[in-house]
């Protein structure tokens, strides 16, 4: 039996998605509105990711890097010198501007601990400019990541 989900296609970003200017006086909002999930620091998430895995939370930080092809992921850190978490937009259903690096991000979603395949890691490095400091011997990467249901971006002046 086939389900409708098997025919679902991922969304593609529009030119506006890729190029919209991030405001300085308000937030550019993508995905679902940020709700009332508990706000948790990224430092707390990194200290004990299993405590937050699968739970809806809100994190804030600085976008240190983002996807240069579609705007389907960003790396967000507590501050520019801290460890970053990869934020993927849920179900590839919304996108952020390609020039999001340096913006303040407020993100709601769930923490995940997963292993990325070597092929995915290679793609993210070659196509999107991703960086990995902890590559496993077989080329895979085990990482703490964040699946965003909504994101708000504000340009820091």
Question: Which role does the model predict for each range below?
Answer:
Residues 1-11:
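Bacterial Sec-dependent N-terminal signal peptides
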Residues 9-157:
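OB-fold and OB-like single-stranded nucleic-acid-recognition modules
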